[in-house]
Amino acid sequence: MLIVLSPAKSLDYKTPIKVKAPTLPEFASESAKLIAELKKLAPQDVAKLMSLSDQLAVLNVGRYRDWSKKFTVDNSKPAIYAFDGDVYDGFDVKSLNTKAIDFAQDHVRILSGLYGVLRPLDLMQAYRLEMGTSLKNIRGKDLYAFWGGRVTDSLKALLGKQKKPVLLNLASEEYFKVLQPKELDCPVIAPIFQDAKDGKYKIISFYAKRARGLMARYVVENRITDPEDLKGFNLDGYKYFAAESKIDKPVFRRAERK
């Protein structure tokens, strides 16, 4: 089983960590090509392109300027520790043991507008570049054109080494669109997380994002490789709901939060 996650907008480069053997991004040379395009932009261009405040635009122009082709522990941080949004709050890497993190390194991939795809322990320099950004580049009008089949090919090679190749899609639609699922030659499972509110079950964005991280955590903690075992997911009160589930879209529900 291979999990794909979205990245997060929020980053944490302040909290110190200890990682014995960080790795390097597979597509660092491709990232450098995008950085070259981003370095051409003034703060007002970045603000308009990414719908950012002037303050955030200035921050990210500085990040593009300082980005280096050489990744070190001084200018980078392993991706799974650097991302700090709802998904990563649910995943809570800081409380995982070494064996779980080792499993994650082999079975979790983070999709990224700048880096294409990252392993959890890949060193990552701070950036802001969402996959849906219409950044013109050497390959086309946006990042989907830039990455083309590269990310898909990377995941396909990895899935080809697994006894039971299955892709567990815990990424957002914006990021999953960078993949060509039919080319992966394996089942794709996309769980649905619903919370009770006002007597009805519905997808609530904040809770659903966190639940994706929780499920990724559940998989790596329990070394799950068989999709059938996902039905046991029970973190934070979620339970498998068979009546509304499909093989490729299992539904997990939770009672209303009080």
UniProtKB/Swiss-Prot annotation:
One cellular component (GO) term of this entry: cytosol
Pfam families hit by this protein: H2O2_YaaD (PF03883)
Superkingdom per UniProt: Bacteria
InterPro entries per record: YaaA (IPR005583)
Family label: Belongs to the UPF0246 family.
GO BP term (any one): response to hydroperoxide
Protein name: UPF0246 protein Pnuc_0753
HAMAP family to which the protein is assigned, alphabetical: UPF0246 (MF_00652)
